[in-house]
C-alpha cells in the first residue's frame, strides 16, 4: 500500500512539475493537441489551447500551426477542422495551418503530427495542451524523435475538469512507463 501511494505521489509530482516549468522555444511549428468539440465548436478547454497556440504564433514562436485531432463521438466535424476554423476566424491565414485529422489519442496526435512535420520539412515544434497533459506528451515526443518544447494552459473556470484530467493522467503516465519498460 505504501508503495502504491509513493508511486502516485511521484507520478503526480512529475506531472505538476513539468507542467509548471515548461517554457516554449522558437520552433518551426506549433502543435495544438485536440480536445472535445461540441458540435462544430471548440469546448472551453480546446479554446484555451487554441488561444495559447495563437499567442505563440502571433509572437513569432512558430511559422506553422499543426492542429491535431480526429472526429470523435458526438462531434459534427473533426477536432482539427474545428481548430482550423477557430484560428482562421482569429486571423491566421489558412496556408499556415496544417490539418492532422486522423488521431484519436495522444500517441496518435504525436505520431501523426510528426508525419505532417516531415511532409512539410519542419524539424521542431512547440506542443500546446493542458499543463497536466504535457509530461506524457514530452515522453511520447522523445519516443517519436520530435524536437519539442512545451506550453501548457490551465483553465481556472473549469477547475473540476482540470482536476479530473490531472487524476486521469496519473494512471495514463503509469501505463506509459509500464509499456515502455
What are the language-model segments listed below?
Residues 162-181:
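A transmembrane-helix-recognition feature enriched in membrane-embedded lipid enzymes
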Residues 1-11:
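Hydrophobic membrane-insertion alpha-helices, especially the h-region
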Residues 11-166:
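A structural signal for short, hydrophobic/glycine-enriched beta-strand patches
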